Amino acid sequence: MRYSNSEKAMAKAEELMPGGVNSPVRAFKSVDTPAIFMDHGEGSRIYDIDGNEYIDYVLSWGPLILGHKNKQVIEKIHEAVDKGTSFGASTLQENKLAELVIERVPSIEKVRMVSSGTEATLDTLRLARGYTGRNKIVKFVGCYHGHSDSLLIKAGSGVATLGLPDSPGVPEGIAKNTITVPYNDLDAIKVAFEEFGDDIAGVIVEPVAGNMGVVPPVEGFLQGLRDITTAYGSLLIFDEVMTGFRVGYNCAQGYFDVTPDLTCLGKVIGGGLPVGAFGGKKEIMDQIAPTGDIYQAGTLSGNPLAMTSGYETLSQLTPETYDYFNKLGDLLEQGLKDVFAKHNVPITVNRAGSMIGYFLNAGPVTNFEQANNSDLEMFSQMYREMAKEGVFLPPSQFEGTFLSTSHTEEDINKTIQAFDTALSRIV
């Protein structure tokens, strides 16, 4: 494949933007390959500015659960644009999406729309602190909750890709109120609560960690968090920005049958447009302005384009959609295991619904430390070879791959064959 147009575009971009990108992972640094500039998408395919075609498993990092350029979503967005892009006042589209979210997520009795997942998590922490009158938040090593100061501590995803354990610029006074413990380790949580329980406002967790690859919770972990937060009067916060409506029809909390106090959403609920949301029990949510004293606001929060796109996206998801995802996911998971075994290369495949992660190690992978044991050099080689075969994978070991309703069994079979071909060149 040729990338001459992407290389020229990146050279210009580096003159204009830090690193030439507006989000670090797009620089493709961890896979030692030139950044790829995309032109358009269609269904399960994405096309770069050099004309190369790929089966897309990035899907804009998760939001495009229906695939690219879904006809119904695009039509409704066009209708919304014809009326105007933003009004600074409420619209009926906000009511429609809010009602659908509340209907699908039983733990959410009221919801507040924002413009990004980072906004959702930082506002949720302020709400948790204001509601409980406490200061400390517990998060898990390798879980990424956006780039707000108090959560950019021992995060996964982009900072892991760049080899940064933490980000400079986070004040010590803020960092001291964030307690970090290993993911899937209930004993560590118990120790944290024994020492700081009276001042812990909440525990925030990705119910499926999607920013250290894909790492599902071990049996009893999420329920254990529910039990200990209840015992200490702290709030359990599920960051479902990635897992929301991707792991299951009722999100990860429905899939695992564990009810949080507050939930953060994003990605899928915008259908590819910028969006975030957080919600929970009425008694907690009513503490937010204008009904309460905890301030939160946003110029473009609930903007009609994102609300329309999100509503039309969620409207197309049914319980049967997730049966289809499981069918494709089973096929891809087993295919990966078989083809890597054929080439005598160790692999661990983790999956939760339409989220799939593979690690080039013998496993298991249940936490960030184990995820870091993956063969990163071979992962980079694999990425480059798969791109040559027309498969677009996340350019980072610490990101998951995603399925959409546009993917087919033929796509999966082609992808497995591509892995076979790639491995034959590498080993």
Swiss-Prot record:
The catalytic activity of this protein is classed by the Enzyme Commission as: 5.4.3.8
Catalytic class of the enzyme: isomerase
Tell me which UniProt keywords the record has, alphabetically: Cytoplasm, Isomerase, Porphyrin biosynthesis, Pyridoxal phosphate
Sequence positions bearing N6-(pyridoxal phosphate)lysine: 267
Subcellular location per the Swiss-Prot or TrEMBL entry: Cytoplasm
- Keyword Cytoplasm tagged: yes
Major location category of this protein: cytoplasm
Q: Name one GO molecular function term.
A: pyridoxal phosphate binding
Q: Which reaction does it catalyse?
A: (S)-4-amino-5-oxopentanoate = 5-aminolevulinate
Needs which cofactor? pyridoxal 5'-phosphate
Kindly state the subunit structure of this protein.
Answer: Homodimer.
Looking up HAMAP family in the UniProt record yields:
HemL_aminotrans_3 (MF_00375)
Q: What protein family is recorded?
A: Belongs to the class-III pyridoxal-phosphate-dependent aminotransferase family. HemL subfamily.
Q: What is this protein called?
A: Glutamate-1-semialdehyde 2,1-aminomutase 2
The species this protein was found in: Staphylococcus saprophyticus subsp. saprophyticus (strain ATCC 15305 / DSM 20229 / NCIMB 8711 / NCTC 7292 / S-41)
Species lineage: Bacteria, Bacillati, Bacillota, Bacilli, Bacillales
